[in-house]
């Protein structure tokens, strides 16, 4: 059907390209409908691996699609599926990818935003493997603009969860396996494009949600995603990964029991599914088939099976390569009964990868800045190695300065000499209150002088304020009354200080009360006493009874009673007896 559409529309497409601009608006709706059907036919041939590259036919189709996009009103009739099919068919072509790329860059993505959002929200479309392939190519290429519209991962995960449940009920369903495979690839590709914070959020959601817990294998089966999560280095994320790995192993062990029973491997040897589960928990790198084969070779003895895994002594007749794993890439060619051919939308050519410079589809590892340096390859000469601080070059100050540095220094010196003195603020009155106590030897006298000066200022300002409060307004700066006030204060305050005093006097009740009390009663600052603090001085007065020199010493304590003194005993030699000579 698609071959008939393409062959019959070749002449029509070439004629539509030569239609004059004045007649084009009447022909544009029919041309838009024709190009949509033609692109759909190209996509069907691409899926079946029967697309025959014809440079002239493809080029005419690209030019006609470009002309329809530039026509007002035709863009509304072109849907997101047609745009994605155009991308998948012609951007992967080895001959016309440059023309297709130029057309895709001109698509107004802002006008297509609502259509793409509405299309991706239809979750039933993602149960079709062909639609998942189409969106997968769209996600990898990102050709329209920097603002690319992706299907929401939150909408794709429930569909994948339902497909996994269907596969558990009917493991022999090849259609469900194919849909699950391509939908899983689409979700993994979207996760690759997401940020680190988004990736952690999806991991938490998969672990916390009971309905989506069976989709956790999407993260752990992709080595790049798993390594990316481990590289984040957060201890909480590592704990989440450990918890997710335990859940994933439980899922694998749960599937193993049903898989062993369905394949009938335990007919020869009675194998307990619990032993298979225990062996997989001990050795997570084993698949279900390998665990069953080790148990079969060990006659169901789990200890002997563990020993065979450690020593890798599996018999040749029980090689695991003869069995197929549970979740593998479905054989699409056998389902459609077609010869084995590479499906075009699944691989990007080198020319397309060169055009799409922002994303690389074959990037397996995350490279760093210092990955291919000399230190990594150990290509450092011994002359560059040193201990502690780098040794100083003794001939550094003997070297001549480059001419560029000399000219730059001379220019800076010339600019510094040519700069004139700035006398803008020389004529301004910079007088202000001066603390007369600074540098005085007597701090008490300086404090009293400052207090008297402040009292004089408060009294003067208070008197002027009682006579005419308008003198303190900002508008009265050039008035005669303000000039008299400044003369009275001997220009010790500025206009701003005078106006600020009035603002404090009217708003701060404590300050106003203190000023009134000081002016009225002259009490001044309560922190400073009315009398100066005197220092203690040694008196020269001597009592007359001490002048005659008859002063006697008065003991500090009474003398001891002589009768209470201890007796001193003197040790005497004993007298000799009379019979001793």
From Swiss-Prot:
Involved in activation of the ribosome quality control (RQC) pathway, a pathway that degrades nascent peptide chains during problematic translation. Specifically recognizes and binds RPS20/uS10 ubiquitinated by HEL2, promoting recruitment of the RQT (ribosome quality control trigger) complex on stalled ribosomes, followed by disassembly of stalled ribosomes. GO terms for biological process: rescue of stalled ribosome. It comes from Schizosaccharomyces pombe (strain 972 / ATCC 24843) (Fission yeast). Residues 552-581 have a biased composition (Basic residues). GO terms for molecular function: ubiquitin binding. Keywords: Cytoplasm, Nucleus, Phosphoprotein, Ubl conjugation pathway. It is found in: Cytoplasm; Nucleus. PANTHER family: CUE DOMAIN CONTAINING 2, CUE DOMAIN-CONTAINING PROTEIN 2. The modification Phosphotyrosine is found at residue 386. Residues 422-448, 522-581 are annotated as: Disordered. Residues 271-314 form the CUE domain. This is CUE domain-containing protein 3. PROSITE patterns: CUE. It holds the Pfam family CUE. Residues 522-542 have a biased composition (Polar residues).
């Amino acid at each position: 059907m698609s071959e008939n559409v393409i062959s019959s529309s070749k002449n029509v497409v070439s004629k539509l390209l030569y239609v004059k601009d004045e007649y084009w608006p009447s022909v544009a709706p029919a041309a838009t409908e024709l190009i949509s059907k033609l692109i759909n036919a190209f996509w069907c041939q691409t899926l079946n691996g029967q697309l025959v590259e014809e440079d002239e036919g493809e080029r005419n189709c690209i030019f006609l699609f470009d002309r329809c996009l530039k026509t007002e009103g035709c863009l509304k009739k072109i849907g997101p599926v047609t745009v994605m099919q155009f991308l998948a068919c012609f951007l992967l072509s080895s001959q016309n990818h440059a023309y297709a790329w130029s057309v895709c860059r001109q698509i107004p993505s802002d006008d297509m935003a609502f259509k793409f959002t509405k299309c991706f929200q239809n979750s039933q479309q993602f149960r079709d493997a062909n639609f998942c392939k189409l969106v997968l190519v769209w996600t990898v290429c990102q050709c329209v603009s920097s603002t690319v519209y992706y299907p929401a991962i939150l909408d794709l995960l429930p569909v994948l969860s339902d497909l996994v449940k269907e596969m558990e009920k009917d493991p022999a369903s090849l259609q469900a396996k194919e849909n699950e495979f391509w939908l899983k690839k689409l979700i993994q590709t979207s996760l690759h494009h997401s940020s680190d914070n988004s990736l952690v959020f999806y991991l938490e959601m998969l672990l916390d949600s009971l309905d989506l817990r069976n989709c956790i294998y999407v993260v752990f089966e992709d080595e790049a995603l798993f390594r990316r999560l481990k590289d984040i280095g957060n201890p909480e994320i590592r704990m989440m990964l450990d918890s997710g790995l335990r859940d994933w192993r439980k899922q694998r062990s749960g599937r193993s029991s049903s898989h062993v029973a369905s394949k009938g491997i335990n007919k020869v040897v009675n194998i307990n599914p619990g032993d298979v589960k225990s062996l997989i928990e001990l050795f997570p790198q084993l698949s279900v088939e390998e665990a069953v084969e080790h148990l079969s070779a060990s006659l169901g003895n789990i200890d002997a099976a563990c020993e065979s895994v450690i020593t890798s002594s599996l018999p040749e007749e029980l090689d695991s390569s003869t069995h197929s794993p549970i979740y593998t890439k479905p054989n699409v060619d056998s389902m459609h009964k077609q010869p084995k051919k590479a499906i075009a939308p699944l691989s990007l050519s080198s020319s397309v990868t060169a055009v799409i410079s922002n994303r690389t589809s074959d990037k397996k590892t995350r490279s760093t800045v210092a990955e291919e340096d000399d230190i990594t390859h150990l290509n450092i000469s011994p002359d560059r190695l040193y201990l502690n601080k780098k040794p100083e070059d003794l001939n550094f100050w003997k070297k001549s300065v480059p001419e560029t540095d000399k000219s730059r220094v001379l220019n800076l010196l010339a600019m510094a000499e040519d700069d004139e003195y700035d006398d803008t603020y020389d004529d301004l009155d910079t007088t202000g209150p001066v603390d007369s106590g600074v540098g005085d030897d007597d701090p008490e006298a300086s404090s009293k002088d400052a207090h008297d000066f402040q009292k004089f200022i408060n009294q003067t300002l208070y008197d002027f304020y009682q006579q005419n409060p308008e003198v303190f307004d900002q508008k009265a700066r050039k008035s005669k009354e303000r000039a008299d006030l400044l003369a009275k204060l001997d220009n010790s305050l500025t206009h701003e200080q005078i106006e600020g005093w009035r603002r404090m006097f009217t708003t701060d009740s404590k300050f106003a009360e203190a000023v009134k009390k000081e002016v009225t009663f002259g009490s001044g600052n309560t922190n400073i006493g009315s009398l100066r603090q005197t220092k203690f001085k040694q008196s020269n007065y001597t009592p007359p009874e001490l002048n005659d020199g008859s002063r006697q010493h008065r003991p500090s304590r009474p003398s001891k009673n002589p009768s209470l003194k201890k007796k001193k005993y003197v040790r005497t030699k004993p007298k000799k007896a009379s019979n001793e000579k």
